[in-house]
Swiss-Prot record:
Gene Ontology MF terms in the entry: 4-hydroxy-tetrahydrodipicolinate synthase activity
CDD domains the UniProt entry points to: DHDPS
Listed name of the protein: 4-hydroxy-tetrahydrodipicolinate synthase
InterPro entries documented for this protein: Aldolase_TIM, DapA, DapA-like, Schiff_base-form_aldolases_AS, Schiff_base-form_aldolases_CS
HAMAP family linked to this entry: DapA
């Protein structure tokens, strides 16, 4: 098998700022630059955290283009390109490649619940249509299907399949996938709260919600881990843990948008059916921000 691209460290699952119901381009571009200056290792626009379900295709493509333009090659951009329609996923992936993305993140098809063979054919069709790496996004709590290790192993044989964003929250799965695909199969956690255990089982990084508001701390955690400084990594994990928990009290991305509004980074606006968080969640998020040293 030919060598495949390595993805390591803290990748931020970027929020999408809105203003007066429209995309806030200036705020988004500012976020990209702030993330890079704070040491984040990669950027992932238009995923779940970026409210991709409520973006039009035109808006989706614009956000990808803005991210790539603003990143200027300083960090990898892994563009969201998921859909439960294979044809649409191919269209989004081809656009991302043409725009200059380093890779695409493709979620397992949700709602229509394909079989394991259906999932294989979905990802194979996307693989055959583009020439950049594909990261499988396996998130059973949202998609209601779980890609098996055997299916993932079949896909790993294809030229562009590079790894997985694993949101199963299963530590066993990390070791199973490493045993099946080897060390070169990129394993990126999709669950902030389990990242310490994920790395201990052989993970390579995280596509993080928390790093929207704490990019430097998240990056420092991964740097410490990669250096073998597990004591420092544990201290950073403890510092971040209340955020990892409290940013998911209500549905993502409502809590993280509130957290970012506390830093003055964006307007808290969400698109329906997402709504702003309740007062008890605001108190919990603010407390976690104080614990992490992000606000007074």
């Amino acid at each position: 098998m030919a060598a495949k691209t390595k993805f390591r460290g803290s990748f931020t699952a970027l929020v999408t700022p809105f203003k007066n119901g429209s995309l806030d381009e200036a705020a988004f571009r500012s976020l990209v630059n702030w993330q890079i200056s704070e040491g984040t290792n990669g950027l992932v626009p238009v995923g779940t955290t970026g409210e991709s379900p409520t973006l039009s295709h035109d808006e989706h493509k614009k956000v990808v283009e803005w991210c790539i333009e603003e990143a200027k090659g300083r960090v990898p951009v892994v563009a969201g390109a998921g859909s439960n329609s294979t044809k649409e996923a191919i269209e989004l992936a081809q656009h991302a490649e043409k725009a200059g993305a380093d890779a695409v993140l493709v979620v397992t098809p949700y709602y229509n619940k394909p079989t394991q063979e259906g999932m294989y054919q979905h990802f194979k069709a996307i693989n055959d249509a583009i020439g950049i790496p594909i990261i499988i996004y396996n998130i059973p709590p949202r998609s209601v299907i779980d890609m098996s290790v055997d299916t993932m192993k079949r896909l790993w044989e294809l030229k562009n399949i590079a790894g997985v964003k694993d949101a199963t929250a299963s530590m066993v799965r990390v070791s199973q996938q490493r045993a099946a695909m080897g060390e070169d199969f990129n394993q990126l956690s999709g669950e902030d709260a389990t990242i310490l255990g994920y790395m201990a089982h052989g993970g390579h990084g995280c596509i993080s919600v928390t790093s929207n508001v704490a990019p430097r701390l998240c990056s420092e955690f991964h740097t410490a881990w990669q250096k073998g400084d597990h004591a420092t990594a544990l201290k950073l994990h403890d510092k971040l843990m209340p955020l990892h928990n409290n940013l998911f009290i209500e549905s993502n991305p409502a809590p993280i948008k509130y957290a970012m509004s506390l830093l003055g980074k964006l307007d808290e606006t969400l698109r329906l059916p997402m709504v702003p968080v309740t007062e008890p969640t605001r108190v919990a998020v603010r407390s976690a921000m104080v614990h992490a040293g992000l606000i007074n």
